[in-house]
Amino acid sequence: MPAVPDVDEVATLARQLRAQLVRHAAAGTWAAPGGRSPRPARDEAEPDVPAAPRRSLAQVRAELGECTRCKLHTTRRSIVFGVGAEDAPLMFVGEAPGEQEDKRGEPFVGPAGELLDKMIEAMGWSRQTVYIANILMCRPPGNRNPQPDEVAQCKPFLDAKIRAIAPRVIVALGRPSANTLLGTDAPISVLRGKFHDRHGVRVMPTFHPAYLLREPDRKRDAWADLKLVIAELDRLGIAAPGTPRG
């Protein structure tokens, strides 16, 4: 006749069983009847990758250093990191610095920047109350479009800036910005006019101010996009520091 376990042994086995059941419940992997393998939870196949730690903008800038991660460092004058409020609920992301931005080390300071300032002010905000950045932080020669290897080196720092600022809404200025932020190759004409979700942040693609200077008839469409941003911020309970015009 097999030995009967004592009370302490039974209590220990019971605690181990309860712990095992709790682990299975948390993982969504209860044992199935008849010895069949349990059906995996919906996200069980994905590795448990911890979220990147949130750093301050100063920490992100310090990590960037005097960046030499891509070939653009050989032709740039300045690293154009970004400008604005470090806790801005509204962020604008463009494409890359131009000649004036490269000289001054600040995004959107040329003619396109003057137009962007007017657009932001028309929404009731300012350069000081939003945050402005670009996909690339170094000027591409001849103001050409960003190349994939350049974007790949800059994007982790853009992601870190977005985590540091934690905006509620991002306005993506132009196709390269929208494509990079949203992971798509769709044209801006398809993406604009509606919100897209990026890890819980609302993204509104619209035309780049430089394009609007070349095609002023599209300013009406861009303003329609920005009015949607104003309405979304209002829905989120975020008041602009000023009063929008019109």
Can you say where each PLM-predicted feature lies in the sequence?
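Charged, compositionally biased N-terminal leader segments and the immediate start
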Residues: 1-16
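A polyanion-binding, active-site-adjacent surface
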Residues: 2-3, 18-246
